[in-house]
Amino acid sequence: MALSFTEKKRIRKNFGRIPEAIEMPNLIEVQRESYEAFLQMNTPREQRTDDGLGGVFKSVFPITDFSERATLEYVSYEFEQPKFDVEECVQRDLTFQAPLKVRLQLVVFDVDEDTGARSVKEVKEQECYLGDIPLMTDKGTFVINGTERVIVSQMHRSPGVFFDHDKGKTHASGKLLFAARIIPYRGSWLDFEFDAKDVLNIRIDRKRKLPATTMLYALGYDTEQILDQFYTRSIYRLDKKGWITSFRADAWKGVKPEFELIDAKTGKSVAEAGKKITALKAKRMAEAGTDEILVTSEALIGKFLARDVVNLETGEIFGEAGDALEEPIIAEMREYGIDSIEVLDIDAGGRGPWLRNTLKADKNETRFEALSDIYRVMRPGEPPTQEAADALFGQLFFDPERYDLSAVGRVKMNMRLSVAVREYESAADNMRTLRNEDIIGVMKVILDLKDGKGEVDDIDNLGNRRVRSVGELMENNYRIGLVRMERAIKERMGAVDIDTVMPHDLINAKPVVAAVREFFGSSQLSQFMDQTNPLSEITHKRRLSALGPGGLTRERAGFEVRDVHPTHYGRICPIETPEGPNIGLINSLATHARVNKYGFIESPYRRVKDAKLTEEVVYLSAMEESIYSIAQANATVNDKGELVNEFVNARVAGEATMIAKEEVQYMDVSPKQVVSVAASLIPFLENDDANRALMGSNMQRQAVPLVKSEAPFVGTGMEAVVARDSRAAIVARRAGVVEQVDAMRIVVRATEDLEGSKSGVDIYRLAKFRRSNQNSCINQRPIAKVGDVVSKNDIIADGPSTDLGELALGRNVLVAFMPWNGYNFEDSILISERIVRDDVFTSIHIEEFEVAARDTKLGPEEITRDIPNVGEEALRNLDEAGIVAVGAEVKAGDILVGKVTPKGESPMTPEEKLLRAIFGEKASDVRDTSLRVPPGDAGTVVDVRIFNRHGIDKDQRALQIEREQIEKLQEDKEDEQSILERNTYSRLRDILIGKDAATGPKGFKAGKIAEAALEELTQRQWWEIELKSEKAQAELQALREQFDASIRELEARFNDKVEKVQRGDDLPPGVMKVVKVFLAVKRKLQPGDKMAGRHGNKGVISKINPLEDMPFLEDGTPVDIVLNPLGVPSRMNVGQILETHTGWACRGLGNIIDKALEEFHQKHDVAALKASLTHAYGDKQEMPETDAEIIELAGNLRGGVPIATPVFDGAREEDINDLLTRAGLDTSGQVRLFDGRTGVAFTRPVTVGYKYLLKLHHLVDEKIHARSTGPYSLVTQQPLGGKAQFGGQRFGEMEVWALEAYGAAYTLQEMLTVKSDDTAGRAKVYESIVRGDDSFEAGIPESFNVLIKEMRSLGLNVELLEDRGGAIEEEEAPVAAE
C-alpha cells in the first residue's frame, strides 16, 4: 500500500492490531445513491427502472377524461442542464435545480354511439415542461434559495404485518389480548384483535370493530369453507359398540381424554380417562398398531360439527356446521339412521375454539350482509346497496390505485406468514395489494399465538423499522403533487375541445412545483445544514430521525422506542444521539452500515467457513442476521486466517455467548463498525463512560474552525476519511501535474483519463473566507506546490478544520491536572496568556448583512452617500455610491450602506418655516434608513455584493465588482487554453517527427520531418503539414478536431459565465437593488467561552492567567491549561488521561526528531535523520523514498509524532509505556511542576501532557448583551426580551421579593413603573433628567390597564377608586410611537 500525497508529508503511527477487511465506504453515499435512484438522471432513457420518478409518472398516468374519449399517456422524461451552477445559486439566493421535460401522448378516441366500441382517432405527442426539480450537489446537500439544506433520512415502521399483545393491561385478570395489524405503504390499515370474550374482531382504519368472520364472508367464503380453512376434521362412524374414529398420534399428544380410549380392533383400553397422553405414549400407541379407537356417545357431547347435518327427505336440519353436539341431537341422528358425522378437531392438537366462537357471534351469514356491515362502518348514515358495498370493499384492499403494500410490505408479509423464508429475494413477488391468502394467513398466525404457539413481533427490532431516504421522501411528495395535478387535468379535459388541444394545454405544473417547494422549504425533515465544521456536515447527512411526517412525536414516544436494541449492532450508533427531549429518536448511522433497496439497514460481515476466514464480505440486515452466529472482530486469528481459540465470543440471535469455533458462520469486519463517525473519532473510546462518550461525540460537532488548524497528536485513523468525504478539503478529480498555485486556485494538467470530449486541464477554485450556515469561516489553503505529481483522490488543498488532509477540530495544548486557587472549581478552565497571544484558539466568524432598496408608495428608496443629519466622520468608510469599502474596520453603529427612504409630507414646524424663508429650499423630505452594524458587533468588511434589477443602471461599485469577476473568468480561460495548446502541440510534435511529409507550408521541404525543421515554423503552421501515411494523417486530423472542439467548448463556457455576470438579477417584486455586506469578526479566546475535549469533558474559561504565574516544567516551559483533576473520577472518562499521557509521548518523540533535524542542517546526514524517524515509528513503518520527502516529513513531525489508536482496538497500556520510554520520558506520565508565582516546586508530581481541546460554538461574545433604550411590546408596553430583539432583563417575581425583603420601596416602585411600562411616567422622567431635576412621579403601569381590560372581557366591571371616594379617571393609553 503506497503512501498517498498527504501521508508522505505526515505519517500517522497506527496502533490497531486488527486488519481492516474492507475499505471505509464513502460516508455520504446514503444521500447520493438514494437521490440518484430517484432521478435516474445519468441512466440512459431505455435502461431506467420503474423506481423513482419514472415509477411515479407510471402510477399516475395514463389519465382518462370522464367521458373516456381521450387519455393522456406518459412516454418518458428528460432533464435539461441547470441554468446556474451551485456557486452562482449560493451567491444569488437561488435554488440549484434543473428543468424537467416530460414527453406525453394525448390519444383521442372515436366512440361508436351504438356499440360503445372505441377506436383510436389520433395521437398527439409533445414535450411538456413540468417545473424544476432541485438537484443534489456532490456534497449530498441541496441549495434552496441560496442556503444549503440537508434532507434527513427518516426511520419509520416498515409496511407489512405485525403481531402484538396488550401485555395484559386491558383486562383486569391480566389476560393477554393478541392483536395483528396489516400496515400498507399507503391505504387503509386492517387490525385483528381478540376481545375479553375471546372473540376475534377486525377494525378497518381503527373504526368500529366487526367479527373477523365478517371479513371472510365478504371475501366470498361460506361457513363450511371458513371452518375448513382453520380446522382439520375427524369422521366418527357408528358401530354396535359405539362411535369409531381413526387414531392420529399427532392429534392426541398432550391431550387429557375425558373418557377412556379403547382400541377398536382388540377392544382393549389403550388410554385411561383424565390421564395426559404424552408424545411418547401417542407414538407407542401408533407403533403398537392402534389405528382406530372406540368412544361412547358421551365422548361426542361438546364436540362441534364440521358440516351441516340434514334430513334429506324433509330438509330438516339437525345441526349446522359449527354447532355443538348435544345428547338430543345425537339421539335424533341415530333415530334417522345417520351413521357417520364429521366433527372439528378443536382442543385436539392444541387448536382452540376461538374462530368457531367468532362465527357463532357473527350475525351475518351471507356475503351481502357482511359487505353491508363493512359499508355501514366505513360510511355511517348511508344506506348500502349491493354495488356500492361491493365497490367500497374492493377499493379498500384490492385496488392498486388506493392500496399499496409496496415491495417492502409484500416481502415482509411473505416472510412473516411463511416460516421457511429468511431471505429478502426469495420472499419477493409483485403483488402489491392484499390476497385472500394473506388475510387467512394473518388470522391463522394470530390464532396460533392465542393457542400459545409462536412469538409476537418486536416493533423496535430493526427488521421491522426501515429508512426512508431523500429519494423516497421526494418521491412521495412528488406523487402528491402529481395526483393534485391529475384532478385538474381531468376537469380541463372535460372543459375543452379535445380534438384541437395539445398535451401542454392540459398540463398545469403549479401543483407539482408547489409540492416540491413545500417539501424542501418547510418539511420537518428538510433541515438547515449544520455547517459548523466538516464533521457536523457529515453527521447531519448520516442522521436518522424517527420524527417527521408519518413518524413519531416527541411526546408520544415511550422509553422502548428510544432505547438501544440488540439489532442496532453495526447499524445504528448506540452512543451518538442528542441529550434532551429527542434522545434516542434521532440517531446516527454506524460507520460501515448501508441502506439496502428495501430501506433496511445492513451491516457487513466476513464469511467464515470451517473456522477459517474467507475474503467474502456479505451485508446482512437485522432479519437475515438473526439466524446466524457472528464472531467479534477481535477474535484471535493466525496468519492463515484460522480462528485460534476453541471457543469464541459471538452473537447468536442478538445474545452474546461463547460458541465453538466451528459453529461460527460470520465475523465482524471491523471493531468500529458498531459506532458512528463522530464516536469513531474519540481515541480510547473504550475507556470512557457511555454518557460522557455521548457528550464527546456531540460536542465535536460544535467545534469552531480555528485560524490555524492542527491535527490531533492522538487520533483514531478516521480523521483523513472524514476530511475527504465531507468535501471540506479539495480532492484531485484525476491524476496530473500541478502547473500553477496561488491562494485562489490550483491548476492541474491532467495526465490520465484524457478523452477527446474532456478538457485536459483541471482548475480548482479555492473558497476564500466564505460564510457558512453557522457564520463560521470557510477558507481553503493549497497544500500542493508547482511541479507536484498528484494521483486521483489525493488531497491538494486544506479546508476549514483540516490539516494536511486530516480533520483538525481543535489544537494540541500542554495540560496539567491540578487545582489552582479555585479557578478550576466545577469544571472551570484556567488558561495561559500565551494561548490568547499566539492566537491558538482564535477563530474568524463571518456575518452577512443585507439591505434592499424598494419602490415604496411615496417613491423609490435610494442607496446613496447623501444621508440627512449625518456627519462626514460617520461616512468615512463609504464610497461615492454609499457602500462601505472592502477592508474597512467597522464597529457597532457604523453605517455599512447608506440608504434614504422618502417620507410623507408633514406639516412644517416654525423652525422649518424660518429655514425655508432664509435659504428658500425645502428641508430634505427623506429619512435615514441606512444599514448599520448591530450592537455588540465589530469587524472587517471582507466582501460586498450588489444585485440590480433587470433594466436598472448599475452604479460605479457594481460595475467594478463585475469587472473583477470577469477578469477572474478571463484568467481561468487563458490558463486552460495555454495548457491545452501546450499539451496538443507536444502530442502533434510526437505525431510529426520522423514521419514522411507530402506537402507543407511555404518554404517547407517534403520528406522526413526533423525536429529542427519544425522549430523554424510557428506552431500554428504545423497543422498545414500533410503526411504521406494515411493513418498518421488521420491521427493528425483527429487531434486537430479534438483541439478545435475543446477551444470552442471553452469559449462557449466562458461567454455563458460572462453573460450571467453581466445580466441583471431576479429580485423579489418591489425590490430595485440589494446590497450584501460580509463582515469578518476575529474572536479571541476569553473568559466565558466554552471549551471541551473529545471525551465529554467540557468547561468554561474562568481566567486568563499571565504567563509568569502559570505552573512551569523543570525546563521552564509554562503549561497552557490547568484542569481540575476532580473532573475525572466521578465522570469515569479515563480516556482523557490516557490521551494526555500518549500526547506527552508524541511530543517527546517530536522533540527527538527536531534535534535530529537541526543536526542534519549542520551535517547533512540523511541516514541519521532516517534513523531518528525509525526510532519514533518502529521499523515496520513504510517511509517515503526520496530524501526531499524524508526532510519534509521530519519537518512536519517536529511538533509531535501523530499516532492513531482506533476505537476498541487501540493502544494498550504497554504500548503507551513503550512510547513514553522511546521519548525518554517517565512512564508514570507525571513530572515535577513549579509554582509560577513563588518558583517553589509543588509537593507532589503532577500529570502533565498534550491533550486535544476544542473551542465550541457557544461563544460569550454572541451571548452577552446589554440594553439601553430599546423597543417595547405594543400591548403591555414592557421592554421586549432576548438579544435578538435588543430586549431587557425581566425583573421577575423573585426579584420583587428580594427588594421587598430589603424594604427598598422606592427602588421597587421605579422598577415596576417608570423603568418598565408606565408610558407617561417614562416620558416625565426623561424630561426631568434633561432639566437636571431628579424628582419624579410614578403613574399607573400599562400592565395594570391590561389586567383591568382582561377582567372586563370576562364580564367583571373593575374600577380603580381613589381614597377620596371618587373614581379615578382612566387615562387613555397613548398609542405607541414608532
UniProtKB/Swiss-Prot annotation:
<protein>
    <recommendedName>
        <fullName>DNA-directed RNA polymerase subunit beta</fullName>
        <ecNumber>2.7.7.6</ecNumber>
    </recommendedName>
</protein>
<keyword id="KW-0808">Transferase</keyword>
<dbReference type="Pfam" id="PF04565">
    <property type="entry name" value="RNA_pol_Rpb2_3"/>
</dbReference>
<dbReference type="InterPro" id="IPR007120">
    <property type="entry name" value="DNA-dir_RNAP_su2_dom"/>
</dbReference>
<dbReference type="Pfam" id="PF04563">
    <property type="entry name" value="RNA_pol_Rpb2_1"/>
</dbReference>
<comment type="similarity">
    <text>Belongs to the RNA polymerase beta chain family.</text>
</comment>
<dbReference type="InterPro" id="IPR042107">
    <property type="entry name" value="DNA-dir_RNA_pol_bsu_ext_1_sf"/>
</dbReference>
<dbReference type="InterPro" id="IPR007644">
    <property type="entry name" value="RNA_pol_bsu_protrusion"/>
</dbReference>
<dbReference type="GO" id="GO:0000428">
    <property type="term" value="C:DNA-directed RNA polymerase complex"/>
</dbReference>
<dbReference type="InterPro" id="IPR007121">
    <property type="entry name" value="RNA_pol_bsu_CS"/>
</dbReference>
<dbReference type="Pfam" id="PF00562">
    <property type="entry name" value="RNA_pol_Rpb2_6"/>
</dbReference>
<comment type="subunit">
    <text>The RNAP catalytic core consists of 2 alpha, 1 beta, 1 beta' and 1 omega subunit. When a sigma factor is associated with the core the holoenzyme is formed, which can initiate transcription.</text>
</comment>
<dbReference type="Pfam" id="PF10385">
    <property type="entry name" value="RNA_pol_Rpb2_45"/>
</dbReference>
<dbReference type="InterPro" id="IPR015712">
    <property type="entry name" value="DNA-dir_RNA_pol_su2"/>
</dbReference>
<comment type="function">
    <text>DNA-dependent RNA polymerase catalyzes the transcription of DNA into RNA using the four ribonucleoside triphosphates as substrates.</text>
</comment>
<dbReference type="Pfam" id="PF04561">
    <property type="entry name" value="RNA_pol_Rpb2_2"/>
</dbReference>
<dbReference type="InterPro" id="IPR014724">
    <property type="entry name" value="RNA_pol_RPB2_OB-fold"/>
</dbReference>
<dbReference type="InterPro" id="IPR010243">
    <property type="entry name" value="RNA_pol_bsu_bac"/>
</dbReference>
<keyword id="KW-0240">DNA-directed RNA polymerase</keyword>
<keyword id="KW-0548">Nucleotidyltransferase</keyword>
<keyword id="KW-0804">Transcription</keyword>
<dbReference type="InterPro" id="IPR007641">
    <property type="entry name" value="RNA_pol_Rpb2_7"/>
</dbReference>
<dbReference type="GO" id="GO:0003899">
    <property type="term" value="F:DNA-directed RNA polymerase activity"/>
</dbReference>
<dbReference type="Pfam" id="PF04560">
    <property type="entry name" value="RNA_pol_Rpb2_7"/>
</dbReference>
<dbReference type="GO" id="GO:0003677">
    <property type="term" value="F:DNA binding"/>
</dbReference>
<dbReference type="InterPro" id="IPR037033">
    <property type="entry name" value="DNA-dir_RNAP_su2_hyb_sf"/>
</dbReference>
<dbReference type="InterPro" id="IPR007645">
    <property type="entry name" value="RNA_pol_Rpb2_3"/>
</dbReference>
<dbReference type="GO" id="GO:0006351">
    <property type="term" value="P:DNA-templated transcription"/>
</dbReference>
<dbReference type="InterPro" id="IPR007642">
    <property type="entry name" value="RNA_pol_Rpb2_2"/>
</dbReference>
<dbReference type="GO" id="GO:0032549">
    <property type="term" value="F:ribonucleoside binding"/>
</dbReference>
<dbReference type="InterPro" id="IPR019462">
    <property type="entry name" value="DNA-dir_RNA_pol_bsu_external_1"/>
</dbReference>
